[in-house]
From Swiss-Prot:
Keywords: ATP-binding, Carbohydrate metabolism, Kinase, Multifunctional enzyme, Nucleotide-binding, Nucleotidyltransferase, Transferase. This is Bifunctional protein HldE. Coiled coil: none annotated. NCBIfam families: cyt_tran_rel, PRK11316.1, rfaE_dom_I, rfaE_dom_II.
Length: 473
């Protein structure tokens, strides 16, 4: 399955469900309490993050999609913190604030990137919450997908009225289910239980074949459009009536924290479907997004650039010819892994042994080598009529095939100052007998603390000489 980045900016989504605040107390631990055999944490940072349905909305907004949220909170500072965080992220939130009942808060005590303790502040909402019919109707008018984010905390008690209202308007409904009765999600377009939640409903599955059979039966029983079972390290399984099962392997490189991974899955699915992607492609994107978010600590969202970079890696564009946006994402990813970026540029009209040796030496100055290539018009201006011999596409393709070269990009100007200002390499390399101050762009690179190096050229290796020899013969 070939993945591509959707137009999330044209994909409005409404989330309705159980909102909560994820609060983190960070601190150091250096001793055991004299009162009990437990560590003493000296708290030096308090951090609030939207959780539950609020995290789903936050993830949707982080991808660049317009997000709206309806939920239930108390009338307290936790609700204010949630509202402020969501507003800062661009999420439109409508809260039903209930007096004398606390906003749900999950407090985690953290030390050295480890969770030592979780404390929950919550009381299930016993009243008939979400009596926000007018607000729901109003917000449904402008969205392309409705998400029901159900954590079983009492905010969602009218599943069917929401599902039917959305279906009447032709709006797909995605539900992240909870509890022992999935009939409340009857008629949904897609539900996304994890394996444990799924087996609570259908019974234990001995193998994949049994999972598929029981899942297909559940689709029929509940009139569901599709079922996506998330299976942790075993990936995901998508089931649709009349279609073969689609199994996707897990994509995580490293797993630090699975908190909120399900939120990331349904938010990416919702945004992708709202953007017009078909379900298999949306599931592929959600699987990729989940692999990113479990590599983060705590409840977290992934951004559009992070997802775009993961798609590039998945589709094999980790190396080769890139556009500027792709290149900047690739550089961000490399720097996140403490890799040094080297930059060189030239026409590279007829690639010869001198070029190859020079590029190998340039690559040795760091971890990643960018080769910026003059486009055809700029080569003609620099070298005169009849040049280039090879088009820019062919020149870049040959350069991209060299083991020393990571990324190749073209530029239209005669010199690469504009590109250097955006790329900001750690090392600028040029071949020849220049002084460092004579290297074009040296002032830019040195201005932000980068390094400029001049490498000697291989003798008797010149594109111009090769061209003249060909012409004479």
């Amino acid at each position: 399955m070939k993945l591509s980045m959707p137009r999330f900016d044209q994909a409005p989504v409404l989330v309705v469900g159980d909102v909560m605040l994820d609060r983190y107390w960070h601190g150091g631990t250096s001793r055991i309490s004299p009162e009990a055999p437990v560590p003493v944490v000296k708290v030096d940072q308090i951090e609030d993050r939207p959780g539950g349905a609020a995290n789903v909305a936050l993830n949707i907004a982080a991808l660049g999609a317009p997000a709206a949220l309806i939920g239930v909170t108390g009338q307290d500072e936790a609700a204010d913190s949630l509202a402020n965080s969501l507003q800062a992220a661009g999420v439109r939130s409508v809260f039903q604030r209930i007096a004398h009942q606390p906003t749900i808060v999950k407090l985690r005590v953290m030390s050295r990137h480890q969770q030592l303790l979780r404390i929950d502040f919550e009381e299930p909402f016993a009243t008939d919450p979400l009596s926000l019919g007018a607000e729901v109707e109003s917000l449904l008018e402008g969205v392309k997908v409705l998400v029901l984010s159900d954590y079983g905390k009492g905010a969602l008690k009218n599943h069917q009225s929401l599902i039917q209202a959305a279906r009447a308007k032709g709006i797909p409904v995605l539900a992240d289910p909870k509890g022992k009765d999935f009939s409340i999600y009857r008629g949904a377009s897609l539900i996304t239980p994890n394996l444990s939640e799924f087996e609570t409903i259908v019974g234990r599955c001995a193998d994949e074949a049994e999972l598929v059979a029981k899942g297909l039966q559940l689709l029929l029983d509940l009139d569901l459009g599709a079922l996506l079972v998330t299976r942790g390290e075993h990936g995901m399984t998508l089931l649709r009536t009349g279609q073969p099962a689609l199994h996707l392997p897990a994509r995580a490189r490293e797993v630090f924290d699975v908190t909120g991974a399900g939120d990331t899955v349904i938010s990416t699915l919702a945004a992708a479907i709202a953007a017009g992607e078909d379900l298999p492609h949306a599931v592929g994107l959600a699987n990729l997004a989940a692999g990113i978010v479990v590599g983060k600590l705590g409840t977290a969202a992934i951004s559009a650039p992070e997802l775009r970079r993961a798609i590039q890696r998945e589709e094999g564009s980790e190396r080769g010819v890139l556009g500027l946006e792709q290149l900047l994402l690739a550089i961000d990813d490399a720097r996140a892994h403490n890799e040094k970026i080297v930059f060189t540029n030239g026409c590279f009209d007829i690639l010869h042994a001198g070029h190859v040796t020079y590029l190998e030496q340039a690559r040795a100055q760091g971890d990643r080598l960018i080769v910026a290539v003059n486009d055809d018009a700029s080569v003609s201006r620099l070298k005169g009529p009849g040049r280039p011999i090879n088009s820019v596409d062919r020149r870049m393709a040959v350069l991209a095939g060299l083991g020393a070269v990571d990324w190749v990009i073209s530029f239209p100007e005669g010199t690469p100052e504009n590109l250097l200002s955006q790329v900001k390499p750690d090392v600028l390399v040029k071949g020849g007998d220049y002084g460092i101050d004579q290297v074009v762009g040296a002032d830019i690179v040195k201005g932000y603390g980068g390094t400029v190096k001049v490498l000697g050229l291989v003798e008797n290796s010149s594109t111009t000489a090769i061209v003249e020899k060909i012409r004479k013969n």
